[in-house]
């Protein structure tokens, strides 16, 4: 029996608008657990009224096919009040750790918006460095419409970046696995070595380095 796919709701946004908040931004990240490349965050402010079949297709980016993510990305960025993207590279991730790096990418994404939101809906995290009212929602990318939209923006933005890095660092098949720790990726690292865009503090790469 196939797993049930949750349809994100706009209940949080509706409740916040009743409380007087207008510019409500959803925030999510992509690439947190990868072995290579940056962690990327998306921030999106969607208008309260949206029409079109695509609206009902929005889901957590992880359950969508690449083609559907691209399709939805185009609608989201064209209909958004504003959207922003932040990225923190592998060297910064190794230096500060993935949790602070993720928060920094989210802060960058908020700063990339063309207008300041008055409330943030964040997938799971709290962002103490951003002095705005906010709410962290567990599984927010599956449950909350604005966060689901942000997850798609983050994922598509990162996937496009990894496809570019694939041309700069051939032989790792980055466009295929997007830097995640697949068997193919680990095999390529074993054969070619660790590249300048790999996260050296992440297992199994740290073990490879420590074993040298």
Swiss-Prot record:
GO cellular component, as recorded: cytoplasm; ribonuclease H2 complex
Gene3D superfamilies: Ribonuclease H-like superfamily/Ribonuclease H (3.30.420.10)
One of the GO biological process terms: mismatch repair
Keywords recorded for this protein, A-Z: Cytoplasm, Endonuclease, Hydrolase, Manganese, Metal-binding, Nuclease
Reactions catalysed, as given in the entry: Endonucleolytic cleavage to 5'-phosphomonoester
Gene Ontology molecular functions: manganese ion binding; RNA binding; RNA-DNA hybrid ribonuclease activity
Record Pfam families: RNase_HII (PF01351)
Residues covered by the RNase H type-2 domain: 22-212
PROSITE patterns registered for this protein in UniProt: RNASE_H_2
EC number of this enzyme: 3.1.26.4
InterPro entries for the chain: RNase_HII, RNase_HII/HIII, RNase_HII/HIII_dom, RNaseH-like_sf, RNaseH_sf
Residues involved in a divalent metal cation binding: 28-29, 123
Entry's cofactor comment: Manganese or magnesium. Binds 1 divalent metal ion per monomer in the absence of substrate. May bind a second metal ion after substrate binding.
Enzyme class, broadest EC rank: hydrolase
Needed cofactors: Mn(2+); Mg(2+)
SUPFAM superfamilies assigned to the protein according to its UniProt record, in alphabetical order: Ribonuclease H-like (SSF53098)
Subcellular location: Cytoplasm
Function of the protein: Endonuclease that specifically degrades the RNA of RNA-DNA hybrids.
NCBIfam families the record matches: PRK00015.1-3
Family membership noted in the UniProt record: Belongs to the RNase HII family.
Name of the protein in question: Ribonuclease HII
